[in-house]
Amino acid sequence: MEQVARSYLIYDITDSAVMLGAINLSGAIPILVLSLFGGAVADRFPKKTLIQLSQVGMTIVFLCYGVAVSIGYLTKDHPESWWVLLAGGTIMGIIIALAMPSRAAIIPEIVDRERLMNAISLNTMGMSFFQLAGPAIAGYIIAGFGYATVFFIMSGLNAAAIVFTLFLPKTLPVQVIRKNVHKEIVEGFKYIISHRTVLLILAFFVAAILLAMPFQMLMPVFAKDILKVGVEGQGTLMSMSGAGAIAASLVIASLPSRKRALTLLLSNIVMGVALVVFAFSTSWMLSLMMMIMVGIGRIGGNTTGNALVQTHTEPEYLGRVMSIMMLNFGLSGLGTFFAGVLAETISAPWAIGGLAMVLIGISLFAVIFLPGFRKID
């Protein structure tokens, strides 16, 4: 819901693909700068507390968005008001950088390792369900009641999440001997470099984030200018991606933990091919079908990538490794900004389609020339 409302609102205000990239970049920079610190924090402090604090911050940000729209400032009548969305994006980036490593690293602390893949898949499926319903609901709420209503609903949902996290079991940090944070971050990098399996998993995971994820923030261009379906159509497109994600989550949750690296690579290829077709499609039905395939590929890669990292990383390094993994979302912001510039310079279809073609090439190379990696469980 938040992504549909925020991206379509800034495109409404500025009518600029570059600004779509800029709003994502505003959150990406804090993630790139602070994620490593967030990983060290996750290894030092109770993860449950960090998660709760992040929900408080998100509640306040969405509340501020809603108020800014309600008083008539964050609207097309005030084209300079885009700074509110960028400021909020920066704050959200800080929150994500400090809390997301804890969100990811807490799973192995409350679930047995042999059930880790299933737990991650079910967790992903839950998020995918909201991605299925949320965007479409957001589109119709915006069309019927305005942007402020969506932002207030998001604020309320995050407030409810604070209550739900109270029921999480309390976990203690794995690391007992505390060192200098800078040294811990350096140790995290050294650990990844010295473990080729973890390094390769992160490399192909970041390739998907950097080259494929920009389509989400550029979706208003396709919905408004190419397919001409408006904000309701954008919500429906994103919901179809959520439907594919749920289908993939159900399948992956039931699969044995075998050749998961191959699943990661094949998921990247599926997502890349679907994005190429979507980028150049002017057919509404074909675009919907491709969004389903994008969702399947995205969740297939995301779930297996997370499970592989958490399976092959020693517990005392997991928070830091997951924080480095979170850097990928910062890189996604850079990729989105670059895609936005490309969209303004050449076209949105060639920006998204071209990046997807690179992802397909990289993944095919790994499938053919890295047999040892594709056999990793």
Regions found by a protein language model. Give the residues of each.
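MFS-fold secondary transporters
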Residues: 11, 64-68, 72, 76, ...
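Short, flexible, glycine-rich and Lys/Arg-enriched loop motifs at helix boundaries
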Residues: 60-88, 233, 332
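C-terminal transmembrane bundle of multi-pass solute transporters/carriers
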Residues: 33, 44, 48-50, 64, ...
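Helix-loop boundary and gating motifs at the non-cytosolic
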Residues: 1-30, 190-239
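Juxtamembrane intracellular "pre-TM" segments in multi-pass secondary transporters
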Residues: 170-203
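Helix-loop junctions on the cytosolic side of multi-pass membrane transporters
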Residues: 105, 109, 147, 151, ...
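Transmembrane alpha-helix termini and helix-breaking/packing motifs in multi-pass membrane transporters
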Residues: 7-13, 66-75, 133-153, 225-226, ...
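Substrate-agnostic recognition of the 12-TM MFS/MFS-like secondary transporter fold
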Residues: 1-6, 25-42, 46-61, 84-143, ...
